[in-house]
C-alpha cells in the first residue's frame, strides 16, 4: 500500500457484502485473487489494490484518506458519519453511486406478546442495538426518550436475556426475529451498498481509473437490470407490443422472409419480464419469444 500511484479500494473481507463486491469487481474486468487470506490483494491487469477489512472500518478508512474508494453498506456509513459528528468532527467523503446489492432495513422489533401502539410504546424503554446513532436520530425526531444498550452481535437475544425491552437491528427475512420471539414493528432506515470516494485532490491517473471503473459499474448494473428480447410480432400491433416492453432505445425491426404480416423484433428492455408480460405479448399475437440475459452493456 506504499505505492501512491495505485488506486486503493476497501471492501468487506467476509460477510454480507463480500461476495457481491467480489462479483462486481470481476464483472468490471478486474482480475484479483481474493481467495487467499491476505489483507491486501493486487489486481493483475490494473493498478488497483484491494484492502480487505471489517465493514465497520471501511467508512473511517475513506474519511481518513487511507484508501481512495470503499464499497460499504449505507447503514454502516451513516452510523459512522453520525458517530464522528457527535464527537465534533467534520467527516468528508463523496458518494459516487448506489449499487444494486446489499439491500437491508434497520428495524425496531419487540416481543410478540407486547402491544405496539407506534414508536411512543418505546418511551422510557431500553433498546439493544449495534446502531446507537441511527436509533437516537430516529427516536429524537419522534420526541421519544429511551435507554440504549450497545451490543455488537446477537442483538436479537437481548429481550429474552433481560438486557433490553426491544431491539433495533438489521432485518432481511425476519426469520431470526421470529425464532427469538420478536416481531418487526417499525423500519427506521433502508440501506443498500454504495461506492464512496475520499475527499481531497486525486491524482489524474487515479481519477481517470475511477471514471473508467464507474462506467463499467454502470454497464454491469444496467446489464443486470435489462434483458435482450427477440420475438416475431404482428405488424398491425407493434405499438402495443413495444408499450409492454420499456427499453433503452427503439427496437430493431427486421422483415421475415415470406411473411408480410409479421416482423422480427429485437430490443433491450429495462423492465423485468414476468410470465404475465409474456402472456400479454402472446395475446397480442407475438410468437417465438426469447428472453436472454445480458453480460455487459454500454450505451
Swiss-Prot record:
Activity regulation information from UniProt: Feedback inhibited by histidine.
An annotated Gene Ontology molecular function: ATP binding
Catalysed transformations (reactions): 1-(5-phospho-beta-D-ribosyl)-ATP + diphosphate = 5-phospho-alpha-D-ribose 1-diphosphate + ATP
Gene Ontology BP terms: L-histidine biosynthetic process
Main location: cytoplasm
Record-stated family: Belongs to the ATP phosphoribosyltransferase family. Long subfamily.
Name assigned to this protein: ATP phosphoribosyltransferase
Organism: Escherichia fergusonii (strain ATCC 35469 / DSM 13698 / CCUG 18766 / IAM 14443 / JCM 21226 / LMG 7866 / NBRC 102419 / NCTC 12128 / CDC 0568-73)
Gene name, Swiss-Prot/TrEMBL: hisG
Amino acid at each position: 500500500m506504499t505505492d501512491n500511484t495505485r488506486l486503493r479500494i476497501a471492501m468487506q473481507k467476509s460477510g454480507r457484502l463480500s461476495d457481491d463486491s467480489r462479483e462486481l469487481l470481476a464483472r468490471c474486468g478486474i482480475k484479483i485473487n481474493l481467495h487467499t487470506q491476505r489483507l491486501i490483494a493486487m489486481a493483475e491487469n490494473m493498478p488497483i489494490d484491494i484492502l480487505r477489512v471489517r465493514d465497520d472500518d471501511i467508512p473511517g478508512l475513506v474519511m481518513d484518506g487511507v484508501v481512495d474508494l470503499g464499497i460499504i453498506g449505507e447503514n454502516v456509513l451513516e452510523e459512522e458519519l453520525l458517530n464522528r459528528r457527535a464527537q465534533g468532527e467534520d467527516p468528508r467523503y463523496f458518494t459516487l453511486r448506489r449499487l444494486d446489492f446489499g439491500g437491508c432495513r434497520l428495524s425496531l422489533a419487540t416481543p410478540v406478546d407486547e402491544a405496539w401502539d407506534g414508536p411512543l410504546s418505546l418511551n422510557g424503554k431500553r433498546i439493544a442495538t449495534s446502531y446507537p446513532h441511527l436509533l437516537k436520530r430516529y427516536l429524537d425526531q419522534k420526541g421519544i426518550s429511551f435507554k440504549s444498550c450497545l451490543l455488537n452481535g446477537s442483538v436479537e437475544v437481548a429481550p429474552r436475556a433481560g438486557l433490553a425491552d426491544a431491539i433495533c437491528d438489521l432485518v432481511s427475512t425476519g426469520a431470526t426475529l421470529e425464532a427469538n420471539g420478536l416481531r418487526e414493528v417499525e423500519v427506521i432506515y433502508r440501506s443498500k451498498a454504495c461506492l464512496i470516494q475520499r475527499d481531497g485532490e486525486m491524482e489524474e491517473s487515479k481519477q481517470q481509473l475511477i471514471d473508467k471503473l464507474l462506467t463499467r459499474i454502470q454497464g454491469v448494473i444496467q446489464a443486470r437490470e435489462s434483458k435482450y428480447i427477440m420475438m416475431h410480432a404482428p405488424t398491425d400491433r407493434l405499438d402495443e407490443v413495444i408499450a409492454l416492453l420499456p427499453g433503452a432505445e427503439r427496437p430493431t425491426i427486421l422483415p421475415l422472409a415470406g411473411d408480410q404480416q409479421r416482423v422480427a423484433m429485437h430490443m433491450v428492455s429495462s423492465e423485468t419480464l414476468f410470465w404475465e408480460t409474456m402472456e400479454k405479448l402472446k395475446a397480442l399475437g407475438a410468437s417465438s419469444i426469447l428472453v436472454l440475459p445480458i453480460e455487459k452493456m454500454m450505451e
